[in-house]
Curated annotation (Swiss-Prot):
UniProt name for this protein: Peptidyl-tRNA hydrolase
Highest taxon, organism lineage: Bacteria
Keywords: Cytoplasm, Hydrolase, RNA-binding, tRNA-binding
Gene: pth
NCBIfam families, per the entry: pth (TIGR00447)
Task of the protein: Hydrolyzes ribosome-free peptidyl-tRNAs (with 1 or more amino acids incorporated), which drop off the ribosome during protein synthesis, or as a result of ribosome stalling. Catalyzes the release of premature peptidyl moieties from peptidyl-tRNA molecules trapped in stalled 50S ribosomal subunits, and thus maintains levels of free tRNAs and 50S ribosomes.
Originating species: Sodalis glossinidius (strain morsitans)
Classification of source organism: Bacteria, Pseudomonadati, Pseudomonadota, Gammaproteobacteria, Enterobacterales
Family under the similarity heading: Belongs to the PTH family.
């Protein structure tokens, strides 16, 4: 396994930039900033793209500018162009089943109702075997309130917790890319904010 493409899921536009559903994009944006890279819009990949070198390895970055439920269009375009296999892709996304201040890495799995993941799995030939960075945003407690919740902006204290987990995930990214997933998982999963 070699991570060659890191994707941060989001909805496009200023009105969504600070919403919980864009937590994946917050991670990719911080990653680019840490490594002094600028994300540039590339229409052929339907998103903002960048490139990092981690431990001598080239890693592409992507924040789709499609709506969340069409994220797979951007991911498939970039993966096809650079011949990147699903198992070499890391997709960062908001996760209702984790609390703010926590993040988890995993390989494969279902989409858990997340429309961005659902479309990516479909566009990668129904292949769910890509890595996920699940960024905790919590759950509103009622499934009927989920849409409003993910499209809402977290209060300041909650956003600080989400940002602290993203910050730790960025620190673990080089371990994931240059060493191994288990080491990165152990460090990230042990993280506690504060």
């Amino acid at each position: 396994m070699k991570i060659k493409l890191i994707v941060g899921l989001a909805n496009p536009g200023a009105e969504y930039a600070a919403t919980r559903h864009n937590a994946g994009a917050w991670y990719v944006e911080l990653l680019a900033e840490r490594y002094r890279q600028t994300l540039k819009e590339e229409s052929k990949f339907y998103g903002y793209t960048g490139r990092l070198t981690l431990g001598g390895q080239d890693v592409r970055l992507l924040v789709p500018t499609t709506f969340m439920n069409l994220s797979g269009k951007a991911v498939a375009a970039m993966a096809t162009f650079y011949r990147i296999a699903p198992e070499d892709i890391l997709v960062a996304h908001d996760e209702l089943d984790l609390l703010p201040g926590s993040a988890r890495l995993k390989l494969g799995g279902g989409h858990g109702g997340h429309n961005g993941l659902k479309d990516i799995i479909s566009r990668l030939g129904n292949n769910p075997q890509f890595h996920r960075l699940r960024i905790g945003i919590s759950h509103p407690g009622d499934k009927n309130q989920v849409v409003g919740f993910v499209l809402g902006k977290p209060p300041t204290a909650e956003r600080q917790l989400i940002d602290s987990a993203i910050d730790e995930a960025v620190r673990c990214t080089e371990i994931l890319v240059t060493q191994d997933a288990v080491k990165a998982m152990n460090r990230l999963h042990a993280y506690r904010p504060g």
